[in-house]
């Protein structure tokens, strides 16, 4: 299958990457999402909890300054340590505009509302169609 080349791809600096930082405490589910995104051409950094997610975001922000990487976060809402909502709140308090897509097995309206209030680009309830998440990542990924 031929990969469609977009203007975004051709504008990228030679060393730049399209990076997704994926935080999900279910190892098998995290692996499934990662494989779908990697087939789409994204580099995926996996984190098993919110603390590892926050550390990965800090690293990506530092590298982005040097290499002009484009990246976003996909995070489970309920994880050990810091939740996806906690990490999103920390990023927004630090004036970090990194796009965040949230996923959750506990998708009540209050959870969705809290995610939207904090600036989540999207909130997906588990189980969801991984192709819908893939589409959301494509639409949400910042330009180079």
PLM regions with names:
Residues 86, 107-122, 135:
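Alpha4 helix (beta4-alpha4-beta5 surface) of REC/receiver domains from two-component response regulators
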Residues 85-96:
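Short amphipathic alpha-helix used as the core "switch/output" element in two-component signaling
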Residues 46-72:
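Acidic, metal-coordinating helix/loop segments flanking the phosphotransfer/catalytic sites
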Residues 126:
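A Lys-centered signature of the CheY-like receiver
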Residues 80:
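The feature encodes the CheY-like receiver
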Residues 1-21, 27, 31-34, 40, ...:
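Non-catalytic signal-transmission and effector/linker regions of two-component phosphorelay proteins
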Residues 49, 83-86:
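Acidic catalytic/metal-coordinating carboxylates
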